[in-house]
A protein has these predicted regions:
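Elongated, amphipathic alpha-helical interaction scaffolds
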Residues: 1-143
Length: 143
């Protein structure tokens, strides 16, 4: 963040059943995992990123920020923040000049080999993640 604020971030892929319940349960799990530190530190703000490989919301935008409000609308619980990203709605119109955000979304959505190679050349974090995933699948054994 701009203020060097400590944050607790969780990322999950969600299938098409019980979407809202899964988002809330995952948020609470990630947030409460901070208790395991048991060193009296303050809870960091938790943000969960929920990746959907299908369309769920009616709007055209691929990314939603979800916060919980009271039924009166006068209090917003700013600490509770969940992101939902509908990957099928993501469109990258200029694959030659992708922003870092577009690179991540294109990587998570899936892309052709040429685009993937370009993304990995430009983004060291995606390259490292892709190498770890490749190593994992090489070592994974089916039983």
């Amino acid at each position: 963040t701009n203020e060097n604020e400590e944050m607790n971030v969780g990322i999950q892929f969600i299938d098409g059943i019980y979407i809202q319940t899964k988002m809330l349960l995952y948020y609470s799990q990630i947030h409460l995992n901070q208790q395991e530190y048991d060193d009296n530190r303050e809870f960091a703000k938790t943000i969960t990123i929920n990746l959907l490989d299908f369309n769920y919301f009616a709007s055209k935008e691929c990314e939603k920020t979800i916060r919980i409000k009271t039924n009166q609308g006068d209090i917003q619980l700013e600490e509770i923040e969940m992101k939902a990203i509908e990957l099928p709605k993501f469109r990258c119109y200029d694959r030659e000049n992708m922003t870092e955000r577009e690179q991540w979304l294109q990587y998570l959505k899936g892309c052709d080999e040429k685009t993937l190679k370009k993304i990995k050349q430009q983004n060291e974090f995606i390259r490292a993640l892709d190498e770890k995933a490749e190593d994992y699948w090489i070592k994974e054994k089916m039983e």
